[in-house]
């Protein structure tokens, strides 16, 4: 039954939906410890996907409840929403997750109104939190002061973070971690009487790993500190290594990784702590890395509009080979690409618009194993015409007129994805040294193998569809043909029936829609013969259908790959054993 409601009551209903979302988010997150202790790896993957989908499900549920309980004349009167927003601000002022509550309000507003109603008066285009936030710190870290006795501090850490599953070999791990810290850090650090170790109280869980995250610091310097932990089934918990290199820690929090499960009483405080460890990371990426991807989206959007307002940067087409399905543009001074679906695809492409959207959602929900770039989806972006180079705007209007629309002096982009900008692998190799070429091609092969072991087949594996990150990692970013590895039928090319068969431009054998012939990869993937020969030496087993069939068999048996976001010696083949 619809009824009349004051603004404060509507605000309370919106906040009640947020509380429901946060409670279920915490419930899923809190289960990560038990899943790690019980080695429930497939359940961990399901929980990750469930938590990603939870936000949109709860937004839809809240919007439906508002529509059912309130008259349209009250709910859909946009003139009332500045009053509702003010009432909402008063209700979230004392919360410890208030910035997330603002983003939730925005999501509800966008679920009720078209995007042309968006303004800072009706929703939180700009946050109100920094000037209002109470500065009481939550006790979310533990501090250890070795006083020259690092071993004793490590023993205390092992005790404080113990699990219900015993350590595999506590003494061995203590000795190894102690030795690694002494070798990784300058000689004087471990002896410094003022050295302190500060660790976040909550454990970070992701896939088959757990991580203790913090820092080592003296009065003058600091180093990030990460202890990766593994559960070796049948043996126990193992401190796998210790990481103090900022670049390596940055990779652990990379945009190519799945989101961490970590208890976060005060999100802004945790993100601020991580930002001190990783100053090169944007707030958007840090919020996203701990599961608050919608907050990451808000922070990204605010950074984007600030960049456009404070620079002369203009959108240009992204460098690289033009895509057959997507058109990609970028801002030179903003480390992001914007991807839109073309109205018409190249005839060789069998996908449609709906399929492309499904592929991007698959990537969002799946374990990205450090080899798939995360994306954010946006609707109804509006930019001034003056922010586009004429050639860029003309191309976008030509290839995607249903998505890119002129509205006077404003360009409306109805739908797009944003993604971290990388150097296309084919362009990277054009200027690479011999050593860089070998390293990049080796990582390209590892990327394909790690994706395959995680049940992902890229489909179109051309070099142009992979990018190189600032840390030199090779990442796949073209998703229109991506699929589960177990959906593919890997075959050997049949022997020719007659000598003439080999000379024919058409195959002498039938080819199904999911058939893939790995023997054809060398010719399709590499025009450069030197690169082709080098890749065959590095990863020649990718050309053998039996290799792929073996991976499929192990995936169907329920094996979950170990892919470590830090340096290890194992190959992808060994990790499945």
UniProtKB/Swiss-Prot annotation:
Subcellular localization, as worded in the UniProt entry: Cytoplasm
Reactions listed under catalytic activity: L-seryl-[isocitrate dehydrogenase] + ATP = O-phospho-L-seryl-[isocitrate dehydrogenase] + ADP + H(+)
Residues the record marks as active site: 374
Keywords, comma-separated and alphabetical: ATP-binding, Cytoplasm, Glyoxylate bypass, Hydrolase, Kinase, Nucleotide-binding, Protein phosphatase, Serine/threonine-protein kinase, Transferase, Tricarboxylic acid cycle
GO molecular function annotation: [isocitrate dehydrogenase (NADP+)] kinase activity; AMP binding; ATP binding; phosphoprotein phosphatase activity; protein serine/threonine kinase activity
EC number: 2.7.11.5, 3.1.3.-
Residues reported in the UniProt entry to bind ATP: 318-324, 339
Coiled coil: none
Location, primary (coarse class): cytoplasm
Pfam families assigned to the protein according to its UniProt record, in alphabetical order: AceK_kinase, AceK_regulatory
GO BP terms in the entry: glucose metabolic process; glyoxylate cycle; tricarboxylic acid cycle
Keyword Cytoplasm carried by entry: yes
Keyword Cell membrane: no
Signal peptide start-end: none
Role, per record: Bifunctional enzyme which can phosphorylate or dephosphorylate isocitrate dehydrogenase (IDH) on a specific serine residue. This is a regulatory mechanism which enables bacteria to bypass the Krebs cycle via the glyoxylate shunt in response to the source of carbon. When bacteria are grown on glucose, IDH is fully active and unphosphorylated, but when grown on acetate or ethanol, the activity of IDH declines drastically concomitant with its phosphorylation.
Family per similarity comment: Belongs to the AceK family.
Protein name in UniProt: Isocitrate dehydrogenase kinase/phosphatase
Native source organism of the sequence: Pseudomonas aeruginosa (strain LESB58)
Gene name of this polypeptide: aceK
């Amino acid at each position: 039954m619809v009824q009349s409601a004051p603004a404060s009551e509507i605000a309370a209903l919106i906040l009640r939906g947020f509380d429901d979302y946060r409670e279920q988010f915490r419930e899923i997150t809190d289960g990560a410890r038990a899943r790690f202790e019980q080695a429930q790896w497939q359940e961990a993957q399901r929980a990750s996907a469930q938590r990603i989908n939870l936000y949109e499900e709860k937004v839809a549920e809240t919007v439906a409840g508002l529509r059912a309980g309130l008259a349209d004349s009250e709910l859909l009167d946009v003139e009332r929403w500045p009053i509702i927003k003010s009432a909402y601000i008063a209700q979230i002022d004392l919360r410890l997750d208030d910035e997330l509550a603002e983003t939730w309000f925005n999501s509800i507003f966008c679920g009720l109104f078209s995007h042309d109603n968006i303004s800072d008066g009706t929703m939180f285009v700009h946050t109100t939190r920094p000037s209002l936030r109470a500065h009481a710190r939550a006790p979310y870290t533990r501090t250890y002061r070795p006083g020259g006795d690092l071993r004793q501090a490590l023993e205390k850490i092992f005790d404080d973070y113990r699990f219900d599953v015993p350590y595999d070999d506590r003494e061995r791990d203590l000795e190894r971690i102690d030795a690694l810290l002494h070798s990784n850090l300058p000689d004087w650090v471990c002896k410094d009487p003022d050295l302190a170790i500060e660790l976040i109280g909550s454990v970070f869980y992701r896939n088959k790993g757990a991580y203790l995250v913090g820092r080592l610091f003296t009065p003058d310097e600091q180093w990030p500190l990460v202890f990766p932990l593994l559960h070796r089934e049948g043996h126990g918990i193992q401190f796998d290594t210790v990481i103090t290199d900022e670049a390596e820690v940055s990779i652990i929090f990379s945009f190519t990784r799945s989101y961490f499960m970590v208890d976060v009483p005060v999100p802004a405080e945790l993100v601020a702590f991580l930002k001190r460890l990783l100053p090169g990371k944007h707030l958007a990426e840090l919020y996203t890395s701990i599961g608050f991807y919608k907050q990451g989206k808000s922070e990204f959007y605010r950074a984007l509009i600030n960049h456009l307002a404070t620079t002369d940067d203009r959108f240009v087409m992204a460098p690289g080979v033009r895509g057959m399905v997507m058109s990609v543009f970028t801002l030179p001074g903003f480390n992001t690409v914007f991807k839109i679906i073309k109205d018409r695809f190249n005839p060789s492409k069998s996908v449609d618009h709906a399929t492309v959207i499904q592929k991007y959602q698959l990537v969002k929900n799946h374990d990205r194993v450090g080899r798939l770039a995360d994306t954010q989806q946006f609707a109804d972006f509006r930019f001034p015409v003056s922010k586009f180079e004429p050639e860029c705007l003309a191309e976008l209007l030509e290839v995607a007129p249903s998505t890119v629309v002129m509205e006077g002096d404003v360009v409306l982009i109805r739908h797009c994805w944003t993604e971290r900008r990388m150097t296309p692998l084919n362009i990277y190799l054009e200027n690479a040294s011999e050593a860089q070429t070998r390293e990049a091609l080796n990582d390209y092969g590892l990327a394909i193998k790690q994706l395959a072991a995680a049940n992902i087949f890229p489909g179109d594996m051309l070099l142009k569809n992979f990018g190189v990150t600032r840390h030199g990692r090779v990442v796949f970013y073209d998703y229109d043909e991506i699929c589960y590895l177990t959906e593919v039928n890997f075959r050997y090319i049949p022997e020719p029936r007659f000598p003439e068969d080999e000379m024919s431009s058409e195959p002498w054998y039938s080819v199904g829609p999911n058939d893939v012939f790995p023997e054809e990869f060398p010719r399709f993937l590499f025009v450069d013969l030197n690169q082709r020969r080098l890749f065959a030496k590095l990863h020649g087993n990718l050309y053998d259908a039996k290799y792929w069939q073996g991976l499929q068999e192990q995936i169907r048996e329920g094996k979950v790959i170990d892919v470590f976001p830090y340096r290890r010696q194992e190959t992808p083949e060994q990790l499945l054993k």
